[in-house]
Amino acid sequence: MFVAAMTESDQNIINLLFSGHYADPFAVLGMHDTASGLEVRALLPDAIDVWVVDAHSGRKVANLQCRDPRGFFASAIPRRKKPFSYRLAVTWPQDTQVIDDPYRFGTLLQELDIWLLAEGRHLRPFETLGAHPSTLDGVVGTCFAVWAPNAQRVSVVGDFNFWDGRRHPMRRRRENGVWELFVPGVGPGQLYKFEIIDCYGNVLVKSDPYAFESQMRPDTASVVSRLPPALPVDEARQHANELQSPISIYEVHLGSWRRHTHNNFWLSYRELADQLVPYVKEMGFTHVELMPVHKHPFDGSWGYQPLGLYAPTRRFGSPDDFRYLVSAFHEAGINVLLDWVSGHFPADSYGLARFDGPALYEYADPKEGYHQDWNTLIYNFDRHEVRNYLAGNALYWTERFGVDGLRVDAVASMIYRDYSRRDGEWVPNYFGGKENLEAIGFLRYTNQMLGQHHAGAVTIAEESTDYAGVTLPPEHGGLGFHYKWNMGWMHDSLAYMQLDPVHRKYHHDLLTFGMLYAYSENFVLPLSHDEVVHGKRSLLDRMPGDVWQKFANLRAYYGFMWAYPGKKLLFMGGEFAQGREWNHDTSLDWHLLDEPEGWHAGVQQLVRDLNHCYRQHPPLYQCDYLHQGFEWVVVDDRENSVFAFIRRDADGNEMLIISNFTPVPRDSYRVGINQPGAWREVLNTDSWHYHGGNLGNQGLVYSETVGSHSRPQSLVLALPPLATLYLVKEA
């Protein structure tokens, strides 16, 4: 192979190209109009011979000279004055190929995209950044783009170039630090990463933050995949998310809901569509909440330490398979909520951590950027590009996968700089306060953006403090969420239920206190996965007493919860009273439903009936967030641990709910009512259908003109032990 002579200046540039320290490869490679005419230059390590081929005629027009034995070729093109489309005929040691030169194509990102990305206001950054199979000038390939403003050089590497960072260095867009390159011949299914020489000279190999598909762990490469098309917004699904609609959520961890019995392996997305969807529908839940399905390296994080926010985990199948699962839920009339982790990410070397050398996606100061509880890094909400990455992801899941809402994880850790930190371990905000003003601004923007551009999608905050206005609109000083988990109600009610009934009269306020703040936010009542792990025990195991009392307590509690103001959430396994804590490595204990005693099957039947009763009776849901929707009747019967209240819909229709939280039956318990006449017992958690004792009122109960509880009319009821009753006024 003949090597042509080079000037010292030319050789320096070539050396920089091969060492990976030349930041503008397009200034050297490709076709250039020089003083001596058109010239083509190519960087092709291991090539033996290179010809320029006219792309239209297919004729060879020039043999490129080898200017460096490492694989740099260049020559003037004789008798050509105007730039033209060309290809390269390359002879390798094993064969000859005709390839398209990535460096003959112009810039990829439009000026408006560049500006919007820099400002953090690009509505759909995922349409611009990442890997996008495309056709340019009739050439099929993939457009790659990645934000790495501190990098000295970025190359795209993959199967298509032997993972060799010398072969495809990218163009730097100095306006905003994005690197871009169109690589001909690369298509869906091919693996890739970005090789980055950071500002310190270190070579890093990173997965694509915007990858739509990734390899199954422990492999870490991104996969070229087409952007899923946008899905239409369904009016019925929008209505199902509204404040005045019934919302009963089944929280699911896809990897442990059910597994293959012969090898304990996960069900796929499509198998879940066949098994989980009909089960949720039969059980009467209106919504399903999927614990995070983003790419995450560690099974034990349950998805809450994601490293690929735009890629559904490959544990259960492809992105198309996940879309199939979401569609199956929708066809069954079930809305899909997705747990969304926008506060922190793990520090795995191939991920976002120190992406191009210094802290980029995370805060640089560990007092701001390191989460001690979870050993993770905290997103730098002060950077426009980081906020854009996250906000765009929220729209991506709702718009491209049809997800109906996002449950935002660990909001308190985002909005407070001193979250889980002692004095001296956190950095105050600009005004000296503890609030993370940038994170608050991000949440407000994201909630507003979703409301404007994906009507009907809801956001739910897991916020564990008393921060005011979580569900108020941003224009009124709030964060803009639609709903907030009621952690206070959950803690108080479980604390009450764990007490031996003989002691409950001394803690009566645990069940009444919640109504003092029930209308301060739009609350969801959560019995989530967090309540059945880390030694807290299962819900059933937390109930006091013998077997009969444990199940009766749990049934009475569920009855109370389903009637209490607020939307409902129950973690999988709770619907049939799983006896042990949740284990993400195994299936739920479905065999319990086959036990001859029938305790677990009884609870499952109760939850099914509670859901259907809840959906059929507007007083139980229509005015959850209006004072008119709830009225205490019996609030102070500490001695008997009895609670009674009215639920009311917008038309004034009423339901009476009464709970007896002692194991003592109350045979003639008088309860005041507003509306005289016949009242029908429509649900009794002590029914034999639920494996209870079947004490109750056997259908209709007629009012008496006897005053009680400051009301002129009353009912005399038989209250079963450890039970909740629902009664409806007959028309």
Curated annotation (Swiss-Prot):
GO molecular function per UniProt: 1,4-alpha-glucan branching enzyme activity; cation binding; hydrolase activity, hydrolyzing O-glycosyl compounds
Organism annotation: Dickeya chrysanthemi
Enzyme class: transferase
Catalysed reactions, as listed in the record: Transfers a segment of a (1->4)-alpha-D-glucan chain to a primary hydroxy group in a similar glucan chain
Keyword entries, A-Z: Carbohydrate metabolism, Glycogen biosynthesis, Glycogen metabolism, Glycosyltransferase, Transferase
Transferase is among the record's keywords: yes
Enzyme Commission numbers on file: 2.4.1.18
Family the entry assigns: Belongs to the glycosyl hydrolase 13 family. GlgB subfamily.
Protein name: 1,4-alpha-glucan branching enzyme GlgB
